[in-house]
């Protein structure tokens, strides 16, 4: 029997997760909840500027959608605790609104009858933060609410883990060269949160911004908690981003070849490896959570320490979504 999934929040991540779930055997989206009307949601599901047209058939019907012949119920309920998850026998809610980002708030879905909640954002409080194929083995099935971290943390985590496991990570700085997102203005205008830089035209500027990925990494890899810091530079591309990580290593005399070999050996469905001279548009639609770029590895000795700089690509939309769906499937499997 398929795992019944509900998506709360049908924005960029919610819609792309819906698409991705259609390709995963054993998962079925049976309901979505969003305050936008069904006609608009169906249109945005079918057509996507960056990720291309949805290959399935989408039709608006009474009470929701029909997608590839299967009914998906639609709701417009602002209070998650009032959603009919019990009646629909929902196994996992994929929480994509950005509002239910701590355990207490996300608990509203459990009160409504869902068995599990996966938050598509960094979460506050005492929650497990999961980057699939980095620390998903921490899950034991007893969890009711789990965080899927951020797109940048999913890019950073496997790289940082290899450096720490193989060479010893002393400390470091990371920068995400990140595509602009919906929380930036397309034209210069006051920003809704008062951010002067995000108030500027996203497609015309390199915009310094903050990122919580360097700090959040400690929730994924406790051994390096507090060892990383960093920031973001939002750039004029709609999707396709790059994480650069510069670290001091414990091990001495490390070579570029050794670093690249370690990354290649660690590659899997979530963590790719390439020696091709790619650019950001080449990773749009990619399902690796992180793609290590061996051509950008640099090594330098500083006194008796080894300084290493590495880089990994990610589609901040689809890479992250693919990771979320892997975690969702694993979380559901543990509950059977």
Swiss-Prot record:
Keywords, sorted A to Z: Cytoplasm, Glycolysis, NAD, Nucleotide-binding, Oxidoreductase
Entry's EC annotation: 1.2.1.12
InterPro entries: GlycerAld/Erythrose_P_DH (IPR020831), GlycerAld_3-P_DH_AS (IPR020830), GlycerAld_3-P_DH_cat (IPR020829), GlycerAld_3-P_DH_NAD(P)-bd (IPR020828), Glyceraldehyde-3-P_DH_1 (IPR006424), NAD(P)-bd_dom_sf (IPR036291)
Pathway(s) per entry: Carbohydrate degradation; glycolysis; pyruvate from D-glyceraldehyde 3-phosphate: step 1/5
Disulfide bonds listed in the record: none
Catalyzed chemical reaction(s): D-glyceraldehyde 3-phosphate + phosphate + NAD(+) = (2R)-3-phospho-glyceroyl phosphate + NADH + H(+)
Site (Activates thiol group during catalysis): 178
Signal peptide: none
UniProt: D-glyceraldehyde 3-phosphate binding residues: 150-152, 181, 198, 211-212, 234
pH and activity: Optimum pH is 8.7.
Record-annotated active site: 151
Catalytic temperature dependence: Optimum temperature is 25 degrees Celsius.
GO annotation, cellular component aspect: cytoplasm
Major localization class: cytoplasm
Molecular function (Gene Ontology), one example: NADP binding
Positions bound to NAD(+): 12-13, 34, 120, 316
Subcellular location field: Cytoplasm
Enzyme's top EC category: oxidoreductase
GO biological process: glucose metabolic process; glycolytic process
Domain of life, per lineage: Bacteria
Chain's role: Catalyzes the oxidative phosphorylation of glyceraldehyde 3-phosphate (G3P) to 1,3-bisphosphoglycerate (BPG) using the cofactor NAD. The first reaction step involves the formation of a hemiacetal intermediate between G3P and a cysteine residue, and this hemiacetal intermediate is then oxidized to a thioester, with concomitant reduction of NAD to NADH. The reduced NADH is then exchanged with the second NAD, and the thioester is attacked by a nucleophilic inorganic phosphate to produce BPG.
Family: Belongs to the glyceraldehyde-3-phosphate dehydrogenase family.
Quaternary structure, from the entry: Homotetramer.
Official protein name in the record: Glyceraldehyde-3-phosphate dehydrogenase 1
Species annotation: Staphylococcus aureus (strain MRSA252)
